[in-house]
C-alpha cells in the first residue's frame, strides 16, 4: 500500500495542496486587481480561510456517526444531494463504513453506496484501494478532492463549505446529527439529481453566482462563499473527440454544447486573446451524448468546437448519462458529445473583438444536465495554472476556457500556463502540459495583444504527443540522443494507431501534422527532454508524473477507443505508474542496487516468524533479554550477544533459505557476509538496543565505575588545558556544538558501523580545530589525546561509555576497522584516563593498563573470528512449562542436542524437584506427542516449520503421567522428525 497525503492545511484555499510558490507569486495572489471581473469581483481571489481538513475535524459530530446504523445513515443521505456522505460503524464486522449518496442510473430514486474502511495497526484505507491514511480525517479530506476508486469525490454540506470562521463551524458541530434536519442544512431542492429531458431548458436552475458545475479539467478552490477555478491540463487532451466541426460564423464566441439550441452564441469577453487550436481532424460522424455544463455568472450556450488539442475542460467524464445511455460507463460522457462549431477563423481560431462585453441576453438555455450540487466535482489534479503574474493578468490570456466551449468572462480570467514555475521548482511536466504549450508556441504570433502590453509571458517547453505516454516509448535511456528519442516516439505512435478506431487515427494524424509544423519548437522540445533526463538521472516518464490519483488511469482507458477492452491489469499497471508522489518510494525501488534489494529480502526473512531463520532470530532475541537480566559483566554480556549474532550469520550463509534469495553471479562471499551483517543489525540490535543500554547502565552503576567517571569528569572540567597537556587549539563554541550534536546522533544509532562512522567525523572536527592555531603543522596521537579528553569531559560521559563498549564488543570481528579501530581505541583510552584521572601522574600517552586492555580486546576479536564456524552454531527452542504458552523459556543448545539433554536444561530452568518424572512433549494442532530420549527436538522443530500447510505446535515440559492428548489417549512416542 502507498501512503497518501491529505490536502495541506497550510494553503489559503485548503483543499488543493501547494505545488511550490515563491514569495512574489504569493503577493500577486493577494492582489485583487489582477483579475478584472466586473460582475463578481469577490470570487476572483481566494481569501485565506479554513481548509477542508480543518473543517472536517471541527465538524466531525455531523458526519462521523459511530452510533448510527447503516440503514439510518442511508435514510438521511437519500434526502441529501449527490456526494453527501456519513461515516458509521458496522456492528457485525466491527469496522467503519463510508456511506455515500449516489444518484441511480436506472431510475428516479437515489441509492447509497457503502465502502468498508479497513484498519491495520495505525493506518486506514478504503477496501480495494492502495492509498493509506493516518486517520479518518485525512482519509475523508483526500476523497473530498480526489476520488481514487469512488465514482466521484465526496461533498461536504453547503453550510460547512461556506463557513468562514471557526465559530460557525462550532455552531454546526454542536447540532451533531440534528444538523441534517436543521435549517442550516440547505439541500438545494431546486437542483435535480438527474438531467431532465434533452429538450428542456435548464437555465432557470442555474444561479450564476453560487452554482458551478465542475469537471475533470477543473480544480475548484473554495473558501466560504468564494470559488475559484483552475484549468487542469491533465484532461485537456483526454476529453478530445476527433470530430470534424463545421466552421463557426465570424465573430461568435465558442458556446456551450447543447443539442436543443445549436445556433445560440454569445459575444467574446473584452480584450481576451484566445489560444489558437490546430486544424480540426478529418470529418467523421460525431457521437452523441450528454455533457454537464459549467455555471459561471454569465453562462453562454451553443455548440462546442473540437480539435485534437482543444482543451475541452468542462466536460463531465463522471456524470451519469440519461436513461437512454445507461449502458455507457459513467466516465465516458465526454466521448459522446456533439461537436458542431461556429465562429472559428481559417485556422480554427476564434475571431477576436476587443471592446465587446458579455451580453447575457444573447445566451441560450444550457443543456439539461446535472449541476454541481447534483454530482460532485471530478477528482482534482495538480494545479498547473495556480498563480497569476501581473503582466499575464493584464493581458488576460484565458487560454483554456475558450477551447472548452464555455465562457468564463464573468467568473474568472484564467491564468495562462506560461505563468507556472520553472522546471526546477516543480515536478516534470506531464504530456498534456507539454502538448498544450506547443500549441501556444506555434501560434504565438496570431494572438492579439492589448495596447501597452508588449511583454509576453514566457512559453514553457512544448509537449510530447499523447501516444508517447505508452511505457515502451517513455522508458528511454538517459544517454540516448534527442534524435533517438524522437524516432522511438514516432515508432510508438505508429504502433499505437493499430488498435484505434479510424476516428482516433484521424485525430492522431492531425496531432502529428500539427506538431511537425512547428519547427521553432523542436529544439525546445529536445532541450526539455534532455533537461528532465539529466536532472532526474532517469528518463522522464509522463506516466510516472501525471497525477495524484488512480482515477486518471481509469479515465485514460475510458477516453480511448471503445474497441479496446478494459482489463483490470491494464488499469492497475497504469495506476502504478501514475501515482506520482503517493508511490514515490515504490517507483524508485526498481533503481535500487542488487545489494540493497538483497538486504531488504534478508530483513524480511528475519522478520518472518513462519520461516525457520525468522523463528531463530525471534528466539534469539527472547534468549538475549533473559541472558542480560542475569549478567554481571558488561564485556561478557556483549560478547555473548556478538557470538550469537556471528552464529546466526554463519547459519544463514550456509542455509538454503538464503540461497533461494541470492543470485550467485551478483554477490561474492564477502559481499554476502556484509549484507547479512547489516540486516542482523536491524533485526537484532535495533530492537535490543534500549535493553542493552539499560543493562550496561545497571552493571556500571553496580560496580561503581559510572560514579567514578562522573566525579572525575568534574575534576577534569576544573583543570586548565595546560594541566591536561593540551598544546594546540581547542574547539570553539560553534564547533563544540557540532561535536556534541554528532555524539548525540551516535548514541541514537543502533548499528556499530554507523556509530564508528560518526566517531570518525567527530574526530575530524577535533583535528580541524587543533590546526586553527598553527595551520599546516602535523599533529600526532600525543597531541590528539589531551584535546580528546578536553572534548569528552564536556560531553555526556555516560552515553560515551555505553557507546564505546557497544562499538568495541558488537562490531563484526571479521571486519577490518582500519583507522576506525585506532580512533575507537583512542576514545576508549581517553575515557579510561578521565575515569582514573590524577593530576600528579598526568600523561599525554595511553597508560600501560589501558594499552593492556586494548591488547586483550584485539585478542578477543581474533579469537571470535576463528570460532565463527558452522559447527558451533547454537539453536534455540521455546519450551513451556505444564501448559502451552505458559511460563515459556527460550533455551540455547546445539542442533544435535537430544531430548534427554534438553529435559535436563528444562529441569534446571523451571527448578523441578523430581526431574525423573518429567518428559518433553510436542503438541501439534491439538495432538500430543512425546519425544523419545534420543529424539532431536531441533530437527523436529525444523520439520514442523517447513511443513505445509503451516502447523500450530508447542514444546511442553510436564510430568509423564499427564502426557495424554485431548481424547485422553496415551501420547505417541516419536523419534524421527517426520512423525506426522
UniProtKB/Swiss-Prot annotation:
Q: Where is this region: Interaction with RAB5B?
A: 584-729
Write down the SUPFAM superfamilies for this protein, in alphabetical order.
SH2 domain, VPS9 domain
GO MF assignments: GTPase activator activity; guanyl-nucleotide exchange factor activity; small GTPase binding
Q: Is-annotated flag, keyword Metal-binding?
A: no
Q: Which Gene3D superfamilies match?
A: SH2 domain, VPS9 domain
The UniProt entry's sequence similarity note says: Belongs to the RIN (Ras interaction/interference) family.
The protein, known as: Ras and Rab interactor 3
